[in-house]
């Protein structure tokens, strides 16, 4: 929903080998109507372009925007304690999908849930100073701030921790 709550999840199989395009479209149409969907987030991984093409070939009963969103870190989040606490009744695939979708709404609030250490930075990942990485992330969160309406305690706790460290160091 508009606050990032998971109301429903369902799998569709529009691509080979299942090729259930008609069934997938019918399920999507039903969900778009029932939940007043305004946007669809597609993770930028496997079959993302095929999925985007599939969605754009169909006309839904209401206008729906389609976005391809970075999946980076979604698998890290989906297996984390934070994700298990947020969605204890769902498996990692559903948790990851929710994380990707929420990135459309409030990317900072969603990405701050991901521990930056395991996120690869290509062939140079072992050259990255983890202390500097955490400090840089904290500075980014601090510079961006947060909205009063930000849902979830993770970003609020992180900002509070930054504030307390600053207050302890500087009075």
Kindly label every feature range from the protein language model:
Residues 1-7, 104:
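Gly/Thr-rich phosphate-binding beta-strand-loop-beta motif of the actin/hexokinase/Hsp70
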Residues 2-3, 11-12, 45, 69-74, ...:
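Short, ordered loop/turn segments at secondary-structure junctions
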Residues 9-22:
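Glycine-rich phosphate-binding "P-loop"
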Residues 16-18, 65-106:
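Short alpha-helix plus adjacent loop in nuclease-associated cores
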Residues 21-25, 48-55, 66, 94-105, ...:
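Amphipathic alpha-helical transducer elements in NTP-driven molecular machines
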Residues 23-38, 57:
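Short, basic/hydrophobic alpha-helical segments
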Residues 36-47, 66-67:
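Short glycine-rich phosphate-binding loop at a beta-alpha junction
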Residues 85-171:
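Long, highly charged, low-complexity intrinsically disordered interaction regions
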């Amino acid at each position: 929903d508009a606050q990032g709550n998971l109301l429903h999840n369902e799998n569709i199989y529009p691509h080979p080998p299942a090729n259930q395009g008609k069934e997938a479209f019918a399920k999507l149409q039903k969900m778009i109507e029932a939940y007043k969907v305004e946007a669809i987030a597609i993770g930028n991984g496997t079959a993302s372009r095929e999925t985007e093409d599939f969605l754009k070939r169909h006309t839904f009963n209401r206008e729906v925007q389609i976005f391809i969103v970075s999946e980076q870190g979604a698998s890290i989040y989906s297996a984390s304690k934070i994700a298990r606490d947020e969605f204890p009744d769902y498996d990692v695939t559903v948790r990851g999908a929710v994380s990707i979708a929420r990135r459309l709404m409030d990317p900072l609030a969603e990405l701050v849930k991901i521990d930056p250490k395991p996120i690869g930075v290509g062939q140079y990942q072992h050259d990255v100073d983890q202390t500097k990485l955490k400090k840089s992330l904290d500075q980014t969160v601090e510079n961006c701030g947060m909205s009063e309406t930000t849902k979830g305690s993770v970003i609020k706790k992180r900002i509070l921790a930054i504030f307390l460290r600053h207050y302890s160091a500087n009075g």
